[in-house]
A protein has these predicted regions:
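Post-DEXD/H (motif II) to motif III coupling segment of the RecA-like Helicase ATP-binding lobe
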Residues: 1-22
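Conserved catalytic network of the ASCE P-loop NTPase/AAA+ motor domain
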Residues: 8, 32-36, 58-59, 82-85, ...
Length: 167
C-alpha cells in the first residue's frame, strides 16, 4: 500500500497481489531492556543509540548482533549470521531490517519512533512502523511488537491498524 500510488504514476498496467499474513501480530506494550525476551530485535535510529543499546545488552544478557544500513554488506551479513546461528539471542538494528532481511524474530521493540530523514527529525509513519514491526513472527509463527526505553507509547488506534495490517 505504501508504494501503490507511486507505482501507479510510473506504470499504468500493474497487477497487485495482496497476501495475507499467516500469523498473528500483537502489541506487547512497554518493556525494560533487561526484561526483553530472547529472539528479539530492538530498533534504534542512530548508530550511537544502536551501539549503546548493544553494549547494554552485552553487559546484561551476553551479546547482540548489529544491523545498520551503513554497515558493509559483508559485515551486515556476518552480523545476521551471528544472530541466525544462535550465537547471540538479540539483534539491535536500525530500520534497515525492514528492507529485505528476513530473520527468525519473535519480538520487535522500538527504542524510538522518530528518525532523522536527512533533513529533520520526524515521527515514523504507520507504514514504516508496520514494515519494521512485521519482522516479528513469520509464516505460521506469531510475533509481537512493543516499545522500550524512553519511547513514547503507540496510540491505541495505531496499534489496531498495525495488528490488523492496515497501514
Amino acid at each position: 500500500n505504501s508504494m501503490k500510488n507511486i507505482i501507479d504514476k510510473l506504470e499504468e498496467d500493474v497487477e497487485y497481489i495482496h497476501r495475507k499474513r499467516l500469523s498473528k501480530l500483537t502489541y506487547s506494550g512497554h518493556k525494560k531492556i533487561s526484561r526483553i525476551e530472547r529472539k528479539s530485535a530492538i530498533i534504534a535510529f542512530s548508530a550511537e543509540e544502536v551501539y549503546a543499546i548493544a553494549e547494554l545488552i552485552r553487559r546484561q544478557k551476553g551479546g547482540a548482533a548489529i544491523v545498520m544500513g551503513s554497515l558493509s554488506p559483508k559485515t551486515r551479513n556476518s552480523q545476521v549470521e551471528l544472530y541466525q546461528s544462535g550465537d547471540v539471542d538479540f539483534l539491535v538494528a536500525t530500520d534497515a531490517i525492514g528492507m529485505g532481511i528476513n530473520m527468525d524474530l519473535d519480538y520487535v521493540y522500538f527504542s524510538n519512533l522518530k528518525k532523522f530523514d536527512g533533513k529533520k527529525l520526524r515521527k515514523l509513519n504507520l507504514s514504516e512502523i508496520g514494515q519494521i514491526a512485521c519482522r516479528a513472527g513469520r509464516y505460521l509463527n506469531d510475533g509481537s511488537f512493543g516499545i522500550t526505553g524512553e519511547c513514547k507509547d503507540i496510540s491505541p488506534d495505531e496499534v489496531e491498524h498495525l495488528e490488523n495490517h492496515k497501514f
